[in-house]
A protein has these predicted regions:
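Transmembrane helix-loop-helix hairpins at lipid-water interfaces of multipass membrane proteins
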Residues: 10, 16-74, 78, 151-156, ...
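Alpha-helical segments in transporter systems
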Residues: 14-35, 57, 61, 76-80, ...
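Conserved catalytic Walker-motif region of ABC-type ATPase nucleotide-binding domains
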Residues: 98, 220, 341-343
Length: 585
């Protein structure tokens, strides 16, 4: 976990140094208070003492207390600043790291776990930092100076303090040994609870459609009960520990006064006053030693939970993406817009067998390649290899004449416009969604935004909205229909002006008329752009230059619509299930 603190900025490190200086000053002033108290006690009990003497010492005591208060406030402000900045920076590091991870890495953590690590875990680390900066620095200094002040006092008082300290450490060590294993379990159960909650919220329509409310409620209750029971166990351990500590502290105070009473009773005449004042001062310093131990123990009690959180955050930050970025920023001019698969094999991580086998084809600039096949044939997996969502298991993929592994991530993404199966919109407005992301192409003007919306067949419904392109988009685009979201997503891909456009079954929510108009616009307006279309509907792809037929991860046919109708049994079966006899002729 302590590796995370290397990410503290220079400003934060300076603030921590100032905290150290202020805490030393604060402790020094606090330790003067018992000495002033002893002096006042002696003055009060000494015949002939002047009131001015008592007031003088009392004034110094008041100034010391006020100085300690001011320094403690300054320390609190600095610590709050450091912990807040550190938490914000850590979230940013974690967010940037997650964005750089491959799909394989992200699925290994799970989205619910990544959300928990970005929020709850970092909050735990912040809380530890707040406590640690104040208590870890303050406690050893306080304990050391207090022990130095009482080391020359009565040995029996010192022995009582040592016994109390050992008893306190023993109780806390036992409590921590019981509770620490549960801290990691609690974080895992937090992930589980977040996962179930997220499933319920994102799948609420399916849950209602299948009358599965009771099932999901039970699923949530099971996760919630496990989480609650673990929390109760940990809290019971802590609840037992705290009163035990205070019993020890009170017992130490009683022991000091009981020993003091015996010593005063047995001392020679004239030493009672000195012993009495020593007893008052010793009890105060002893409590400061014990409180210092207590503060350290509180930090150590929080540390295991913070360490679990820190390890979880570090696990993400230390994960090296299995997608190694290349160095090339441009393709070969003579192969611009080309895509070529050369004997590509692919299997998902931890899978037993390849789901794509010996895939070989080439698409030239401006051509349209359609990919069709039965469910589970590997269509989406194939096109996800082009932008390197996953890397091939064998063979190679060339984009613009270079292996995709040779490109920088930015350069490869700039060459490709990708429209996923699920239309993803981001909160903001329509214009922000269309011009979303960075590109090496020039910024879009208003008329260009209008134009790409027209190509995507989105301008018609956008113009009917009261605010047009400035119309608000809710989270995940929930205020738009599936077809509208798909058209905005398509406009976003076109707006990047890529060399290659990839559509992963991205016309599925469009009616036949809009589908046909969109395909026509793509052919006429983007004639020089290479297009790859994954589709389930034969009607969406029959005009493609090439149609690639997949079955069980293998190419079983490639050609035009007419050629495949005559020669390919798989394509014939798909076409016959969708087209009329007249359309098949």
């Amino acid at each position: 976990m302590f590796k995370l603190f290397k990410k503290l900025t220079k400003k934060d490190r300076l603030f921590i140094l100032l905290c150290l200086v202020f805490i030393i000053g604060q402790v020094g002033l606090e330790l003067q208070l018992p000495a002033y108290m002893q002096a006042i006690t002696i003055l009060v009990q000494t015949p002939g003492s002047e009131l001015s003497q008592v007031l003088g010492v009392g004034g110094k005591m008041l100034l010391a207390a006020l100085g300690s208060l001011i320094l403690s406030v300054l320390v609190a402000v600095l610590v709050a600043n450091v912990s807040t900045n550190f938490g914000a920076n850590l979230r940013e590091f974690l967010f940037d790291k997650v964005l750089s991870l491959s799909m394989e890495d992200i699925s290994g953590f799970s989205k619910a776990s990544l959300i928990t690590r970005s929020t709850n875990d970092i909050t735990q680390i912040q809380q530890f930092l707040v406590m640690g900066l104040q208590m870890i620095i303050r406690s050893p200094i306080m304990a050391f100076w207090a022990i130095m002040r009482i080391s020359n006092k009565e040995w029996s008082w010192t022995l009582a303090t040592i016994v109390a300290g050992i008893a306190m450490v023993s109780i806390i060590a036992i409590s921590m040994a019981i509770a620490i294993p549960k801290f990691k379990v609690r974080q895992q159960l937090t992930d589980r609870l977040n996962l179930v909650t997220r499933e319920n919220l994102t799948g609420i329509d399916v849950i209602r459609a299948y009358n599965a409310e009771d099932y999901q409620t039970q699923k949530f209750e099971d996760a919630n009960i496990d989480f609650t029971n673990t929390n109760i166990f940990v809290n019971r351990v802590m609840a037992t520990m705290h009163p035990s500590i205070f019993i020890i502290m009170n017992a130490l105070t009683l022991a000091i006064y009981w020993i003091g009473a015996v010593l005063i009773q047995n001392t020679t005449a004239g030493n009672e006053l000195i012993l009495f004042s020593d007893m008052i001062v010793f009890s105060t310093y002893a409590m400061q030693v014990i409180m210092s131990l207590l503060m350290l123990i509180v930090v150590f009690a929080v540390f295991p939970q913070a360490k679990v959180s820190g390890d979880r955050v570090n696990e993400v930050l230390n994960t090296d993406s299995n997608i190694i970025e290349g160095t090339q920023t441009k393709g070969l001019e003579e192969h611009q817009g080309e895509i070529e698969f050369k004997q590509v094999d692919f299997r998902y991580p931890k899978a037993d067998k390849n789901i794509l086998k010996d895939i070989t084809f080439k698409v030239r600039k401006g051509e349209t390649l359609a990919i069709i096949g039965p469910t589970g044939s590997g269509k989406s997996s194939l096109i996800q290899l082009i932008p390197r969502f996953f890397d091939v298991s064998g063979g190679e993929i060339l984009v613009n004449g270079r292996n995709v592994k040779d490109y920088t991530e930015e350069a490869l993404n700039n060459a490709i416009g990708f429209v996923s199966q699920t239309a993803i919109l981001f909160s903001g407005d329509i214009k922000e969604n269309i011009i979303y992301g960075e590109t090496d192409k020039k910024d879009l003007e208003e008329d260009e935004i209008q134009h790409v919306a027209e190509i995507a067949q989105a301008s018609e419904f956008i113009e009917k909205l009261e605010d047009g392109f400035q119309s608000s988009v809710a989270q995940s685009g929930t205020n738009f229909s599936g077809g509208q979201k798909q058209r905005i997503s398509i406009a976003r891909a076109i707006a990047r002006k890529p060399d290659i456009l990839i559509f992963d079954d991205s016309f599925s929510a469009l009616d036949f008329k809009t589908d046909r108009q969109l395909r026509t616009a793509l052919q006429t307006e983007l004639a020089d752009t290479t297009k790859i279309i994954v589709a389930q509907r034969v009607g969406s792809i029959k005009d493609a230059d090439q149609i690639l037929v997949l079955e069980d991860g293998e190419i079983v046919g490639i050609g035009t619509h007419r050629e495949l109708l005559e020669t390919n049994a798989v394509y014939q079966e798909i076409a016959q299930s969708q087209l009329s006899e007249e359309e098949l002729r």
